[in-house]
Amino acid sequence: MERLTLPPGGAEAVDEYLEYRRIVGEDDGGKLFTPEEYEEYKKKVLPMRLQNRLFVSWRSPTGMDCKLVGPETLCFCTHRYKQHKTDFETIPQQRPIALPCRVSGCRCKAYHYVPLNGTQPIRCRCKHFADQHSAALGFTCNACSKCSGFHSCYTCACGQPAYAHDTVVETRQERLAQGKPVGRDVPYAAMGGLTGFSSLAEGYMRLDDSGIGAPSVEVLDSAVSAMDHPFLRAMHAPSTSSPQPLAGGNEVGPSTQLSSLRKPEEDDMAYFERQYQERIKLEKAAKQKGKVPPLPSTKPS
């Protein structure tokens, strides 16, 4: 592997360029601003960006933001969110707010998120991929004449079909009125709906008001069961070397509890074989004592 070395001050120069790219985005047209142009750009754009930021999300009928759009998130037109118009001197009054694509020749008039199926575009009911459809409003298919417009039955992780979701563009005030997080004010371009690291997760995994929400106190205080993660099953008991009683009157110590955890170097076969051998030993030891314990759960996480 080739090793990269930087001259003195090189790391600082890289950080400055990354900061420049996050602030300017695509506004320089591929040609770096001069220091004077950069300062003038920041004086003009940053106050407007902080005041009139727009939050973009892909929302399910239940109100959950299944996807929070960021700078690199692709539109139906296959261009990224940062390649669309995202800065406004005054926020438009009409709803929904249209964010047209700025790429030359693109017919996209408004940002429209479309999910991926793994790494591939999802299919329309006409059997063609999303990127085989026109980016113009109506989203007709370019590969067939029977399609009346893109319509996919792809099911989101929230359980709702893709066609039931909407791409929502809203202001800070509109988002706060719904109790959804808005994060801190940042000067970066095309931040969309990103408000923190958790924004990168899917909605059903996000434990804030934009996702599935925080678990209830009852869930947090509930006892650890055999259905929980092996780490929780091993660590929920008090940290003591005394053996812990199990169902049926059997006892197991911390070392036995920890054995249910997968070791970093183990593959699936080695993990299940080790669990099987430990179960055999427990059965033999129990038979010698005249009792057979229930087999512990070995279901991996």
UniProtKB/Swiss-Prot annotation:
Disulfide bonds, paired cysteine numbers: none
Source superkingdom: Eukaryota
InterPro entries noted in UniProt: Fam221a/b
Region (Disordered): 235-271
UniProt similarity note: Belongs to the FAM221 family.
Name under which the protein is recorded: Protein FAM221A
Organism this protein belongs to: Mus musculus
GN (gene name): Fam221a
